[in-house]
Amino acid sequence: MAPPSRRECPFPSRRFPGLLLAALVLLRSSCSDACGPPPTFEAMELTSKPKPYYKVGEQVEYDCKKGYHHFAPFLTHSICDRNHTWLPISDEPCVKKVCHYIPNPLHGEAILANGSYSFGNQLHFICNDGYYLIGKEILYCELKGSDAVWSGRPPICQKIVCKPPPKINNGKHTFSDVEVFEYLDAVTYSCDPAPGPDPFSLIGESTIYCRDNSLWSDDAPECKVVKCRFPVIENGKQIAGFGKKFYYKATVIFERDKGFHIIGSDTIVCNSNSTWDPPVPKCAKELPPSSTKPPTLSHSVSTSPTTVSPTSSVSGPRPTYKPPVSRYPGYPNPDEGMLNSLDEWAIALIVIAILVGVAIISFGLHRYLQRRKKKGTYLTDETHREVNFTSL
């Protein structure tokens, strides 16, 4: 049997590199003679699927994108030029579609977010004082198919009104015959005269008004008798808020006596449940300042075993010697001030004694000299004679 014949490759291996090089040269020459992908725009797009390369002289068509329309006639195609660039065109004639104009609502205002009615923009609505908005506060310009439309109906501004305020027991409010209250209308409550000795107190806000949400600014107040007990404080006294009876919001201020301090608040107020808030304070006695207690010293006498100590008939602990506090280091000596004052007096007495002694000695010398001068000459009318005498 003859062996199978070997099949030869139509492209010998030695020729393959040459063929590959030729293909690259042809591809390079074809790419250099073509344009790349055509330009893209915000407002318009190609009417056909784009290709990676276009021959010289080849043309592409454009049209406005969805949501845009032709504002004016314009060039809608571009051509691959000989210099391998696209003929310049613009998308400015394609403009956004707009929603229809919405005027300001009665007693309100419509505000464009970006100053335009084109799709994608917003329209905000607000109402004047005394009116509230019924409907959507913001409308959006959206695309519906090929048209631009608003996302809803425009709202309206309705006048703010409140229902009559609630009635209260033991009291009344002004304008009780009015059925509808407008924005910022106000009523004032008051209490009726009480049948007993104590009057009614108005608990809460006396005046309320109609707010922008058609509700009253506060709950209705309450009329009831509020009376707190007479406040009594030991070791202290009342200095403000005197009275025989204490009704709602009565305020009392206390002061402590000397040697005491207040526990609690010195100011209390009668609240709506007839109790003092905070509670009536108390006065506690002030404690003396703490001092360090000196150590106690005790002296004991030891005796020999043969010495028998006498037995005392008095029972109890043995007396111990405690030196005064002034003998410990760091404690002042109570006699120190007395000694200082005595030293001053002693010095003064010594000085006075010296002065008195000097005066006595001076006086004695003076008397002695006077006696010596009395020994002199005695003259008479008849004769002159010298007489020596001694004064007695």
From Swiss-Prot:
Cytoplasmic side: 366-392
Location of region: Disordered: 281-329
Native organism: Callithrix jacchus
Subunit structure: Interacts with C3b. Interacts with C4b. Interacts with moesin/MSN.
A Gene Ontology BP annotation from the UniProt entry: innate immune response
PANTHER family, alphabetized: COMPLEMENT COMPONENT-RELATED SUSHI DOMAIN-CONTAINING, MEMBRANE COFACTOR PROTEIN
Function: Acts as a cofactor for complement factor I, a serine protease which protects autologous cells against complement-mediated injury by cleaving C3b and C4b deposited on host tissue. May be involved in the fusion of the spermatozoa with the oocyte during fertilization. Also acts as a costimulatory factor for T-cells which induces the differentiation of CD4+ into T-regulatory 1 cells. T-regulatory 1 cells suppress immune responses by secreting interleukin-10, and therefore are thought to prevent autoimmunity.
Domain notes: Sushi domains 3 and 4 are the most important for interaction with C3b and C4b.
Identification of the protein by name: Membrane cofactor protein
Residues listed as glycosylation sites in the UniProt record: 114, 290-292, 296, 298, 300, 302-304, 306-307, 309, 311-313, 315, 320
Recorded coiled-coil stretches: none
Keywords: Complement pathway, Cytoplasmic vesicle, Disulfide bond, Fertilization, Glycoprotein, Immunity, Innate immunity, Membrane, Phosphoprotein, Repeat, Signal, Sushi, Transmembrane, Transmembrane helix
Cystine bridges: 35-80, 64-94, 99-141, 127-157, 162-210, 191-223, 228-270
Gene Ontology cellular-component annotations: cell surface; inner acrosomal membrane
Predominant localisation class: membrane
Membrane topology designation: Single-pass type I membrane protein
UniProt-annotated location(s): Cytoplasmic vesicle, Secretory vesicle, Acrosome inner membrane
Domain Sushi: 33-96, 97-159, 160-225, 226-285
Database matches in InterPro entries: CD46, Compl-Cell_Adhes-Reg, Sushi/SCR/CCP_sf, Sushi_SCR_CCP_dom
PTM annotation: N-glycosylated. Probably less N-glycosylated in testis.
KW Ribosomal protein (keyword) present: no
Biased composition (Low complexity): 287-319
Lineage of source species: Eukaryota, Metazoa, Chordata, Craniata, Vertebrata
